[in-house]
Amino acid sequence: MIITVLHSHVSFYFIILSFLFFHALHLVGSDGATITIVNRCSFTVWPGILSNSGSGDIGTTGFELVPGGSRSFQAPASWSGRFWARTGCNFNSDTGQGTCLTGDCGSNQVECNGAGAKPPATLAEFTIGSGPADPARKQDFYDVSLVDGYNVPMLVEASGGSEGTCLTTGCVTDLNQKCPTELRFGSGSACKSACEAFGSPEYCCSGAYASPTECKPSMYSEIFKSACPRSYSYAFDDATSTFTCTDADYTITFCPSLPR
């Protein structure tokens, strides 16, 4: 009988400790965010990933993603960086070397190794909150940017979050079909920003135009904004283009308008 009672107490305490352990794991897991990349395009893309200075590694800086494919990453608390799609890539099966038609990062490899996208490219940008370590900075910030031009449609969706707008953002319109001739890249595989096309300070928000009061939307950025109202169309397009959420996970979808 004594043995039975002791065994019951041990079982009870084991259950309590197990509960506390898994609860602690849940709290640890809530730091950072899971970011999933989905390719709904009818063609293969090679996503590029650039972590900002001081941010941790999330496992890769570039990879191949076939139509219908997906891949997830755990971005740690306080991570910031960007994602984009490289298209028209050709990598040698023996050497691994090659280049991409749009979004190329100049590494000459599938991995971008700390290099960013060469414009034009549609960008998804994130700053993940610091979590419980710093409650003042717990919110995530995210956006889809056309400041460096456009190459593929993109959507960013937040799931499971709170304490913010947590809205879906992106550009589902095929801007390559609406691209002005003077902004067209190559045979029409991408659309340059006015800054990339002309290099003028008023388009690049640089020099005397490096402030929100001086740099205003141009006729070209308005074309982007009209087609994709929640995306950044020029450098100071913050008010309608940056979104926040807390404790969320995110899905980046390339070519989201195609059937699932």
Curated annotation (Swiss-Prot):
Signal peptide limits: 1-32
Q: What happens when the gene is disrupted?
A: Normal induced systemic resistance (ISR) mediated by P.fluorescens WCS417r toward the pathogenic bacteria P.syringae pv. tomato DC3000.
Q: Name one GO biological process term.
A: response to ethylene
Tell me yes or no: is Signal among this UniProt entry's keywords: yes
Please provide the record's keywords in A-Z order. Answer: Disulfide bond, Pathogenesis-related protein, Plant defense, Signal
| CDD domains reported for this sequence | TLP-PA
Residue intervals passing through the bilayer: none
> Per the record's keyword annotation, is Signal included, yes or no?
yes
Cystines in this chain: 41-255, 89-100, 105-112, 166-245, 171-228, 179-191, 195-204, 205-215
What tissue specificity does the UniProt entry give? Expressed only in roots.
Q: What induces it?
A: Accumulates locally in the root vascular bundle upon P.fluorescens WCS417r and P.putida WCS358r bacteria root colonization prior to induced systemic resistance (ISR) and after ethylene treatment (e.g. ACC).
InterPro entries noted in UniProt: Osmotin/thaumatin-like_sf, Thaumatin
Family, per the entry?
A: Belongs to the thaumatin family.
Q: What does this protein do, in the record's words?
A: Involved in local responses of roots to colonization by non-pathogenic plant growth-promoting rhizobacteria (PGPR) fluorescent Pseudomonas spp., but seems to not being required for the establishment of subsequent induced systemic resistance (ISR).
Q: Which PANTHER family match?
A: OS03G0233200 PROTEIN (PTHR31048)
Name the chain's protein.
Thaumatin-like protein 1
**What is the species listed in this Swiss-Prot or TrEMBL entry?**
Arabidopsis thaliana
